[in-house]
Amino acid sequence: MEAETGSTMETGKGTNRGIRIALALFIGGTLVLGTLLFLVSQGLLSFQAKQEYCLKPECIEAAAAIMSKVNLSVDPCENFFRFACDGWISNNPIPEDMPSYGVYPWLRHNVDLKLKALLEKSVSRRRDTEAVQKAKILYSSCMNEKAIEKADAKPLLHILRHSPFRWPVLEANIGPEGVWSERKFSLLQTLATFRGQYSNSVFIRLYVSPDDKASNEHILKLDQATLSLAVREDFLDNTTEAKSYRDALYKFMVDTAVLLGANSSRAEHDMKSVLRLEIKIAEIMIPHENRTSEAMYNKMNISELSAMIPQFDWLGYIKKVIDTRLYPHLKDIGPSENVVVRVPQYFKDLFRILGAERKKTIANYLVWRMVYSRIPNLSRRFQYRWLEFSRVIQGTTTLLPQWDKCVNFIESALPYVVGKMFVNVHFQEDKKEMMEELIEGVRWAFIDMLEKENEWMDAGTKRKAQEKARAVLAKVGYPEFIMNDTYVNEDLKAIKFSESDYFGNVLQTRKYLAQSDFFWLRKAVPKTEWFTNPTTVNAFYSASTNQIRFPAGELQKPFFWGTEYPRSLSYGAIGVIVGHEFTHGFDNNGRKYDKNGNLDPWWSVESEEKFKEKTKCMINQYSNYYWKKAGLNVKGKRTLGENIADNGGLREAFRAYRKWINDRRQGVEEPLLPGITFTNNQLFFLSYAHVRCNSYRPEAAREQVQIGAHSPPQFRVNGAISNFEEFQKAFNCPRNSTMNRGADSCRLW
């Protein structure tokens, strides 16, 4: 996975941020382009003798894009990230409604603008498929702010008046039918209804995915769920920041309950108990560093699970979650059904805690989590109260524009419908051909380095690594099935949206989402298919299918440059991303899966020990990076997989680029860009850095370090290039420079 993101919530306020950003980019780009065009037309550029220059409009555009991002006053050998990105960051301040901002969010915003234009078109019964009509109606209902304001909290209060959603803190304040009864409270019924009807996983996460050791089969899995705060440590630590986050959460819970009709003193009392319970849950959660693939693979049948943790009716829970009206073939789920219990100790501790807790506190917590998830769908008074909470935990000061919130919601609710709408207009099929070139170049580079430069892996393990590399399956653009209108229409046939009932529409999508993964239970894993949303601005590796995936949303400038632009730009940007995803198959987790996607020990003991020894170098390197904005050091162990992928991907893409020069241009360098003095190798590294230009608010920086899988962007860039001798050659970095680690350089692949 490539992108870094800050925490966001679906809230909205109409602003002209998109227009301001577009206008600033247009003016800035026009000025730079105009200057370069004038210099070229007047012959005022000082070209090197006998050096070929590209003067096509695309090359002038590329030169302008590069110059708008760099800061030439910074020494690239001391801080390459600042050299490459300072210009972009200074010209693109973080929007007030975002916790961080960078080239990834910038491209995401541009995709959202395109989706907005598509969804705002009037419904055509003749031209639009049934699924597209539903997407447009859903968007229209989300944009119907007048109806949302008129409804206010009524749709949510309607739910809270019915079992199992009655919220004890509200007492009788929303009517006698809303009074919670301890005698009637059922933990199983509440958890199952939340998961089966609203896709809310509280305490327990139940889902279907491939069996790690039999990857052709789907299996039920049980895991720990999330918390109200993104960072588990914020419930446990006594730092100033953690305390302020807990205080903000507590006040938010109290105020939300009061907005829904609770008595203030009752809300303050009850929510203190709720917070104490959530702290207890945070204490027993399995931390990231202990969540290894081997540790989380605990396969057993439901009968064995019930014997291990008898305090909960696991079979009853699973049967209540799954809607057998949709999946009648699952009616026979019984004690012999296999499940993978990813966190047995967590579940043992969970039911010990719940067994000693007051039912009222448990009910208050469960319903709070449901209410919290629905706040984005309520009126402005709830949105503004959430914004006060967000100011503390994210640093944002305004709400997202309503259209942006709505686009994000529709995209997540109906990904394949929106995906088809997008690719029909904005995806060029010839991109697949160039992506195949990049992918095969990276595959060759990985295998070539494995054969010629890897001296620590024994022959048998190396042979199996080559087999896995050759077996990696690439998916580009979009899944073919989204073009089948009959299939997509049939998939959504039970959904009936109303333009005047946004909240009701949301509940329908939640039910659809809640039941969707159970479709796969008892079915074989389609190893050649993929199910990624085409509008996603990110890329992925799937260990269970040994696939690398590049959705259409990612394949745009400045990630993917077409054939009219220098190849150095594409190889440095999307090429490194291809290498990054490819290398995930051989990182500290991906390496445990064989070429068929099975969790299988295919490494020799000797090679595995040498791999682990070499990872220590990278763990130490990144752990020594201190991020002043976050006030924390990078977690080198937590980010190890992504750091391995960054370093390997950079080497593979550069090697593939040089092979392309040798094969396609007989070793002759590409024409240079006009008006700038960068060589093609330098452009490669600049393009690598440019897609990672990003800035953060302190709150988002702290969260990125605490729970992010990636190192912060500046350390992703500087960390990888400082380990790579080809970068040091390209920029003539002396041995004692910061970007030249020399003998201290780390390398696995």
Swiss-Prot record:
Glycan-modified residues: 71, 238, 263, 290, 301, 377, 484, 736
InterPro entries: MetalloPept_cat_dom_sf (IPR024079), Peptidase_M13 (IPR000718), Peptidase_M13_C (IPR018497), Peptidase_M13_dom_2 (IPR042089), Peptidase_M13_N (IPR008753)
Reported function: Peptidase that cleaves SIBLING (small integrin-binding ligand, N-linked glycoprotein)-derived ASARM peptides, thus regulating their biological activity. Cleaves ASARM peptides between Ser and Glu or Asp residues. Regulates osteogenic cell differentiation and bone mineralization through the cleavage of the MEPE-derived ASARM peptide. Promotes dentin mineralization and renal phosphate reabsorption by cleaving DMP1- and MEPE-derived ASARM peptides. Inhibits the cleavage of MEPE by CTSB/cathepsin B thus preventing MEPE degradation.
All residue ranges annotated as the Peptidase M13 domain in the record: 53-749
Organism expressing this protein natively: Mus musculus (Mouse)
One GO CC annotation: Golgi apparatus
Record bears the keyword Metal-binding: yes
Membrane topology listed for this record: Single-pass type II membrane protein
Swiss-Prot/TrEMBL keywords: Biomineralization, Cell membrane, Disulfide bond, Glycoprotein, Hydrolase, Membrane, Metal-binding, Metalloprotease, Protease, Signal-anchor, Transmembrane, Transmembrane helix, Zinc
Residues noted as binding Zn(2+) in the record, renumbered to the chain: 580, 584, 642
Name by which UniProt lists this protein: Phosphate-regulating neutral endopeptidase PHEX
Biological classification of the source: Eukaryota, Metazoa, Chordata, Craniata, Vertebrata
